[in-house]
């Protein structure tokens, strides 16, 4: 996953600053171009997840430059991760969906289970992957309510043909429990720290 790491602000503060100035589009474009540039500079070949606002998309002229610059090298390598965000633009979503799917790339839905990204969004977006929010995962091995909710969510998502990522796995016990209930992929400090 390509993560934004601003130097003088938290990611949350940066987003708030740009949102307040109605300039989230700048972050969207910088994220796409910056993530793919870093991806190729580091010699990666596996898929890369890039965070994206559901309220924005790269404009057609920007997309043309993006596809011309990175071309077929990114076909099938990108996972566009739709962030939990209160604003959603149907027009931008239609364009983003068309553009991403035309290059055989995937969609994931981030922070599932927190309220905004829920089954309604799964029905609408039809993601290939859903990432269970860390709040569902933390200490799941000790919490019967979380276990029931997570197990049910994984079963329903699998019925939709969606792969499930457990985010924020920090202990062997969490990992082992999530394996036992069918999570497909895992992310968290137990497995690796960001580099």
Residue spans of the language-model regions?
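EAL-family c-di-GMP phosphodiesterase catalytic domain
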Residues: 5-8, 81-88, 106, 110-195
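A general structural detector for well-ordered alpha-helical segments in enzyme core domains, enriched
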Residues: 35, 62-69, 92-100, 118-121, ...
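Sensory/regulatory domains in signal-transduction proteins
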Residues: 1-6, 54-58
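Flexible, glycine- and charge-enriched loops at secondary-structure boundaries
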Residues: 21-25, 143
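A short, polar/charged loop-to-alpha-helix boundary motif
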Residues: 4-18
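Catalytic core of bacterial c-di-GMP phosphodiesterases, primarily the EAL and HD-GYP domains
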Residues: 25-95, 105, 168
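Structured helix-beta-strand junction loops
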Residues: 21, 44-45, 76-77, 103, ...
